[in-house]
């Protein structure tokens, strides 16, 4: 990549970082929101769902819109919407108002990752694409790992409203960066056609998802189930089994984000050595190591293996997901925005399913069962993926 291309990728990565952080920083703030808004703890988790559902479900929609109207133009609108929505959340006087603001924010944030991924595909050469997407997603998911710790600290020091303001300001900075993107090599938008519409979009999306490239999209779905499913339970695991309070647990989870950043920087080299399918294999091996370390942590009650597991989980995820994005761009080069959006859709819908299935596993056999089931599922994904994914 040239220095200008790297600048574009890092600018887009920062936008993705803010969009990912905007979801995950809320989790440690939930107890404070319960106290301030005087609501039951059992219902406040709807704040997370209110953001995550549109964030995942609308990624293919935003990707397809970007294909038609232009990616930079769309990014300027949706990043601005993310900033405004996050700042509005800080002013919410009640839980219904906060939920409404989170839904609105999630709708704007939904397109940032998928549109940015497709734009990176426009900016860099095919040879540099895997490395560029890896760097983009490494920066993006650093936000997921770091935001939980930062959100918890800000909430403890100055309150949850201040946390929303801080992340809203970061979104404004991201918007200013997008406004400076000019002449970055985006291909011309197709401008729409008479056949466009909801029915045509759904038909195209289903045809693409279950078409010849279905192995790529279905692997994204199972990746979400396993990696995000495991990640979602690590915070409660650290509290219940390792005895860590909220802030130390959040700080430990920041190693997930640091590993994402490191893995995103290394993914291009790994791809050069082993190919795209080999990069996915390395990521899956790292995920298996994370499951094994979490099992050790469960048996011993020590948080040290869990710290290494958080890093392995982040490294594994950032090697698998962006590589699937790169493979998806070849499924239909005329609709790269839709294809990258379908990857995001698969991952986040899978993450939601993983949370539900993980809860069943814990109810049936505790955290030991969760880690064992996750390892078995990932081993199965590895075997099937090695045979089914494109040999690149």
Can you annotate each of these PLM segments?
Residues 2, 183-217:
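Juxtamembrane intracellular "pre-TM" segments in multi-pass secondary transporters
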Residues 36-38, 70, 91-97, 108, ...:
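Helix-breaking motifs and short loop linkers at transmembrane-helix boundaries and internal kinks
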Residues 57-95:
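Conserved MFS/SLC helix-loop-helix module at the cytosolic interface between two early adjacent transmembrane helices
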Residues 59-70, 263-276, 362:
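Helix-to-loop junctions at the C-terminal end of transmembrane segments
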Residues 81, 85, 96-105, 304-312:
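Paired small-residue
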Residues 101-142:
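Cytoplasmic helix-loop-helix junction between adjacent transmembrane helices
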Residues 126-182:
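Helix-loop-helix hairpin linking two adjacent transmembrane segments in secondary transporters
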Residues 277-324:
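C-terminal transmembrane helical hairpin of 12-TM major facilitator-type secondary transporters
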